Amino acid sequence: MISDKIKLTAKDILEKEFKTGMRGYQQEEVDKFLDMIIKDYEAFHKEFEQLKQQNARLKRELEEQKLVATQVPQQPVVQTPVAQPVYNNTNTDILKRLSNLEKAVFGSKLYE
């Protein structure tokens, strides 16, 4: 796990004492830099904890969804024959209209 690999905490960084030599560092500059590191470290830790919680929540939701999916019986989808009568009625209407149109256009020539 990642928390096993992390060696420092924000507190460790804050409390770290550095030795100074003859031509040592500027203490204020190092302190400001360490303060920035601490803030970033705390933000990363907070984000990490939120992501762990979100990950755990999503895993629970996934397991719940899997459980629900296995409990719902799979029923075959049955199509109702509603479309067929409509199709037959449409054909009948078209044939009647065609017959009426032929009578109107050709008149009595068809029946002679």
UniProtKB/Swiss-Prot annotation:
A single GO BP: cell division
GO cellular component: cytoplasm
Cellular compartments annotated: Cytoplasm
Coiled coil: 38-72
Record's keyword terms, sorted: Cell cycle, Cell division, Cell shape, Coiled coil, Cytoplasm
Pfam families: DivIVA
Similarity annotation: Belongs to the GpsB family.
HAMAP family: GpsB
Chain's role: Divisome component that associates with the complex late in its assembly, after the Z-ring is formed, and is dependent on DivIC and PBP2B for its recruitment to the divisome. Together with EzrA, is a key component of the system that regulates PBP1 localization during cell cycle progression. Its main role could be the removal of PBP1 from the cell pole after pole maturation is completed. Also contributes to the recruitment of PBP1 to the division complex. Not essential for septum formation.
Subunit structure: Forms polymers through the coiled coil domains. Interacts with PBP1, MreC and EzrA.
Protein name: Cell cycle protein GpsB
Organism: Bacillus cereus (strain ZK / E33L)
